Regions:
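N-terminal basic, low-complexity leaders that serve as flexible interaction/assembly modules and, when applicable
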Residues: 1-87, 154, 220-222, 326-328, ...
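Hydrophobic faces of well-ordered beta-strands that scaffold small-molecule active sites
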Residues: 14-26, 32, 39, 44, ...
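Glycine-rich tight-turn/loop motif centered on a GG-T
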Residues: 41-46, 87-104, 145-158, 191-204, ...
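Active-site loop segments of alpha/beta catalytic cores
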Residues: 127-134, 146-281
């Protein structure tokens, strides 16, 4: 199902999030449960894992997010690399010891398995089918942890990630996956000779992205790439890519050239309307007094309960203005979604993260 299809009563742009949240509980038991959940083991750890993932997903839905990502409490790199055979984790990073393949029983992301298993509950509580965003860490970002990588590293990672997305797309009457995002926060951030123009690495990375997103498109599900910088234009060449998103202050959202790219390549934007760097949010409140010590002092007061983290969140009006500016600049037909610029794992509390999502939803509906 396309995210651009909507009932007459719905808004033109749908709210979404990027995935991560602060974990409110005991992380060691939770992480143990994540590794055991899809193996069908029933114990305290898997019960906690299912409970926390289901609760957080429902909280996102109740906050008004129309296309919530699965709640991401685990490390975005380790949750994928730990599922692979043919790798050895060394002090300097991951070293390939053979052909990369998925470990038996690790094809399904446990977070997605929880959501599918609890689909009846979500449908009952919300009174309508849910839509889900599945995020996978991309081959470029994962390969950054390989000290001895070459262009074939992208190829191998692209192949196994294609298998992952294939196994994690589902559609049932209670809900369905409507968006798969390839998260590449490191792409374009630093100069990388391996992907210079004209290199095999550049072509192999493009082919890896195409492999992953092409597999998704065959399931009639929309695709997205999550970036932090868009100065390197390679991503525009992915034919199976549908939606582009980046950070609030990325030139992508300001440049006239972006509209040309969107129209020539027939792609959509996700408007990033909420800043997720909490240090930056504090500094914006402090203004001229935003020294490092002052920011650290605010964090201490939040931790002690003296200050509420919600007082540092951006207001609905600012989020709405960012969305309006993006729509005015590129046309409502090119802005499929609006949401946070990145994950909310760096927020001080779980509650402040959910409040941020509620404001994003309100800004989108207004």
């Amino acid at each position: 199902m396309s995210i651009s299809s909507r009932e007459e009563s719905e808004g033109m742009t749908k709210s979404c999030d990027v995935g991560s949240l602060p974990f409110p509980g005991e992380s060691d038991t939770f992480l143990e449960g994540a590794t055991r959940y899809t193996a069908g083991i029933d114990d305290v750890s898997t019960e906690l894992f299912e409970q926390e993932v289901a609760r957080a997903f429902l909280d996102k839905l109740k906050a008004g997010i129309e296309i919530p990502a699965f709640p991401q409490f685990r490390d975005m790199n380790d949750m994928f690399l730990s599922a692979l055979k043919g790798l050895e984790k060394m002090t300097e990073g991951y070293v390939e010891t053979g052909t990369l393949t998925l470990k038996q029983g690790r094809e399904m992301l446990p977070e997605v398995a929880v959501i599918r298993r609890n689909a009846d509950r979500f449908h009952l509580e919300m009174g309508k089918p849910f839509q889900l965003r599945v995020c996978v860490t991309g081959p470029y970002t994962l390969a950054s942890l390989f000290p001895y990588k070459n262009s074939q590293t992208y190829t191998q990672l692209g192949r196994v990630l294609s298998e992952v997305v294939e196994k994690n797309v589902f559609a049932v009457k209670q809900g369905e996956v409507v968006l798969v995002s390839v998260d590449e926060p490191l792409f374009g951030v630093v100069d990388d000779p391996l992907i210079d123009r004209g290199t095999d690495g550049r072509e192999d990375l493009l082919a890896a992205w195409e492999s992953i997103m092409g597999r998704v498109k065959k399931r009639d599900v929309e695709t997205c790439i999550h970036l932090h910088r868009t100065t390197d234009e390679l991503f525009w060449e992915v034919e199976s890519l549908g939606v582009v998103e980046s950070h609030v202050d990325d030139p992508l959202y300001e440049m006239k050239a972006t509209r040309g790219w969107l129209e020539r390549k027939d792609k959509l934007l996700k408007a990033s309307v909420a800043t997720t760097d909490f240090d930056r949010l504090i500094k914006e409140k402090l203004g001229l007094n935003a020294t490092g010590d002052a920011v650290a002092d605010i964090w201490k007061k939040i931790a002690k309960g003296i200050l509420s983290p919600e007082m540092y969140l951006e207001d609905v009006g600012l989020m709405k203005k960012r969305l309006e500016d993006t729509v005015e600049r590129f046309g409502v037909e090119r802005v499929a979604m609006a949401g946070t610029e990145c994950g909310l794992r760096g927020f001080p509390t779980y509650g402040s993260a959910i409040e941020c999502l509620r404001r994003v939803s309100e800004a989108t509906w207004q």
